[in-house]
A protein has these predicted regions:
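Bacterial N-terminal signal peptides
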Residues: 9-17
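Short, well-ordered beta-strand elements
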Residues: 24-36, 74, 84-86, 106-109, ...
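Bacterial N-terminal signal peptides that target proteins for export
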Residues: 1-8
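Surface-exposed binding/hinge segments that line
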Residues: 88, 107, 121-181
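Sec/Tat signal peptide C-region and signal peptidase I cleavage site
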Residues: 18-22
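Gly/Pro-rich hinge or "lid" segments in bacterial periplasmic/extracellular proteins
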Residues: 144, 153, 159-233, 239-242
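Aromatic- and charge-enriched surface segment that lines or borders ligand/interaction sites
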Residues: 74-122, 156, 246
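N-terminal lobe/hinge region of extracytoplasmic solute-binding protein
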Residues: 30-80, 111, 195-199
């Protein structure tokens, strides 16, 4: 699993088979198949990741130089022993429905990864977080997890051990924020319709299952000025010959 910056994924589709221009600021991309899930902590497939990295963003993102750079977090500090990281969210962050984003959304998102009932397939990636492995295996309470929303714009991660790749890991979709008020309505199926608030450069406007998923530019994205596309249509054509004929 690799963290990918949203526009790297979009740039890549321009040189892949199954991609075509459908308008001046719109592209059509062949997703191939219907994503099994686009829940950040349940997804383990490329098709789901393609959608997720276009509609969501974590504390950090991966830049064009393939290195971590500030995403929703504008800055961070590390303790001298490397065991505590404090992230400061950008001012004015909002979800696609206009609701303010807070550090609690990130804390909740990370907690979902280690909730045993969710059986997150990539939870082991986050075992560097204090009590992460223990929470996932049910030997520690989620309240003991080393993730704290200090205030609305400050998130602290306490670690089990220093991790030189931690910033890279934080760009992965398993660390994306989540809205408790949305998820708790249907913990296992909340993302199935696509009608949920997003925090990335795009947001879902239509999902015709097994046919097409459409995303449009998210006006509330903090870096919206750099998003040059208005719409991306992700069609689902599994057969290569059919895909070639369609484009």
């Amino acid at each position: 699993m690799k963290g990918k910056k949203w526009f790297l994924a979009l740039a890549a589709v321009l040189c892949l088979m199954g991609t075509a221009w459908a308008g001046e600021r719109e592209i059509v991309y062949n997703l191939g198949i219907e994503p099994r899930t686009i829940d950040p902590v349940l997804n383990s497939a490329v098709d789901g990741s393609t959608v997720l990295y276009n509609i969501s963003e974590g504390l950090v993102r991966i830049g064009l130089d393939d290195a971590p750079e500030p995403g929703c977090a504008e800055s961070w500090e590390v303790s001298e022993d490397g065991m505590s990281w404090t992230f400061h969210l950008r001012e004015g962050l909002r979800w696609s429905d206009g609701k303010p984003m807070t550090a609690e959304d990130f804390r909740y998102g990370v907690q979902r990864m280690f909730t045993p009932e969710n059986a997150c397939p990539f939870a082991y990636v986050g075992y560097f977080i204090k009590n992460g492995e223990e929470c996932f295996k049910g030997t520690a309470k989620l309240e003991e997890l080393g993730v704290t929303a200090v205030d609305e714009r400050t998130l602290r991660l306490d670690l089990k051990h220093p991790s030189p790749l931690m910033l890279d890991y934080l760009s992965y979709h398993i660390f994306f924020p989540a809205r408790a008020d949305v998820v708790e309505q249907d913990p296992r199926g909340w993302s199935a319709s696509g009608s949920f608030p997003c925090n990335g450069p795009f947001m879902i406007t239509e999902w015709q299952h097994n046919s097409e998923l459409t995303v449009v530019k998210n006006p509330h994205y903090w870096d919206a000025d750099k998003v040059k596309l208005d719409k991306v249509r992700m069609v689902m054509i599994n057969d290569v010959n059919t895909a070639l004929a369609a484009f």
